[in-house]
């Protein structure tokens, strides 16, 4: 990954603050490999990672108008935090769906699954 200069980061931030869509292209070009790796620490499936990153970049664009640049690295940290939050949200939603599925199973099936899982 190439290193972004502070001027380049500030340019992206200015574009984000203005709502300029080219800021997302620049952000993606610079940080997609890093953000993909961060997301992969939480989620294993490639399709899920792509979906999470898409949601994260949409959120970055939506929230970019209020992002406050605090110096070198703050843009990267902000983008990383959004990806982590989106990954955790995805995992919570998955767990909730799994719980709903398990709640609909008859009690004997739930007991059998629990017994198999524990052994």
Which ranges hold each PLM region?
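Extreme N-terminal regulatory/targeting segments of RNA polymerase sigma factors
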Residues: 1-14
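Conserved catalytic/ATP-binding subdomain
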Residues: 7, 47, 73-77, 105
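Sigma70-family region 2
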Residues: 17-18, 57-72, 93-95
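Internal acidic/polar
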Residues: 89, 97-119
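Structural recognition of an alpha-helix C-terminal capping motif at a helix-to-coil junction
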Residues: 37, 51-58, 62, 73-85
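Arg/Lys-rich amphipathic alpha helix in sigma70-family domain 2
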Residues: 66, 70, 81-101
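A short, charge-rich alpha-helical start-of-domain segment used by transcription regulators
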Residues: 13-37
């Amino acid at each position: 990954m190439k290193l972004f200069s502070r001027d380049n980061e500030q340019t992206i931030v200015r574009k984000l603050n203005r709502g300029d869509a080219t800021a997302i292209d620049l952000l993606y070009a610079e940080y997609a490999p890093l953000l993909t790796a961060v997301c992969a620490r939480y989620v294993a499936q490639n399709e899920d990672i792509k979906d999470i990153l898409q949601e994260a970049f949409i959120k970055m664009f939506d929230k970019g108008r209020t992002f406050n640049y605090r110096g070198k690295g703050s843009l990267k940290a902000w983008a990383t935090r959004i990806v982590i939050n989106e990954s955790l949200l995805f995992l919570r939603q998955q767990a909730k769906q799994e719980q709903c599925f398990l709640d609909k199973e008859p009690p004997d099936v739930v007991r059998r699954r629990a017994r198999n899982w524990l052994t």
